[in-house]
Amino acid sequence: TGEDLRLAAVNLRQETLGYQKLPLPFENTPDYGRRLADLLEAFLDAHQLDRSRLLGVGLTLPGIISPDQTAIQYAPTIAIRSTTPCRFLESIPYPVRLDNDANCGGFGAWWNREGRQSMAYLSLSRGVGGAFLANGRLYEGSDHRAAEFGHMCLHPGGRRCQCGRRGCLEAYCSAARLSDDLGLSLEAFFSALDQGDLNCRQVWERYLRDLALALTSIHAILDCPVIIGGSVSQYLPPFQGQLAALVEELDPTAQQGS
C-alpha cells in the first residue's frame, strides 16, 4: 500500500496458508529490498512453508509498471513520477513478478466470480485504481495504462490530485478523503459514522455521491458489472442500497455489481 507490507501465502486452490501485515513504508532502495527479503524468509519460517514448493513471489504496487516488470513508470502515491528502475527486487531469491495492485485485485475478483464474465474493477484504497477484464483477459491499453479510473476527471477544476491535476476521482474517493480530512484512521471514521457523528456523515454523503457518479461513468463506457475492492470496500455493505439508489438516479439503465 506504500505504508505497510502485506504478505500472503496462497496455494493453487486459492487457499490462504498464511497472512501477515507489517509496518514497512515503501522505498525503492536496495536496503528496502534486503529488509523485504528478510521479512519474507521470516514469514515462510513462521508458517512452516516448504521453500522447495514455492513457485514464485508476486509483488503488487499502486502504480504503472513497465511491460518488462523492471521499472515503475508512474506511481504518485509512492512518490514516483517518472520511470524508475526497481532497485529493491535484486535481494529477493525467488522468481518474482511485479504488477499493478488494481490489475491483480481485478483478476482475483474476476477469478472468484460465478460465470466469469467481463467486468470492471474499482479499487478504493489509499489511492484509487482500476482494471478491466474482457472475457478473462486483462485489457492494458497501448501503453499499459488502461482503466486508471482514479485519474478520470470527476469535477473539472476541483481538488488537486496527487498526480498534479485537479478534479480526479482519486482526490474525492480515496480512503484518504475519509480518514486524513478528519484526522482519523479509516476504522475510526466508520466507527464515528456508525455512532452518528455529523461531520463524518456529511463527508460520507459527499463520498457516496461522487462514487455513484464514477460508477455511472465507468458503466456507461464499458457496459459491464463494476466490482468495488480495496480497503474502503469492506465498509460498503451497509450502504449498498443507498449507493445503488444514487447510481439509478444518475442512470436508470445502469446495473452495478459490487
Language-model region placement:
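Adenine-nucleotide phosphate-binding core of ATP-dependent small-molecule kinases
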Residues: 30-50, 169-171, 177-237
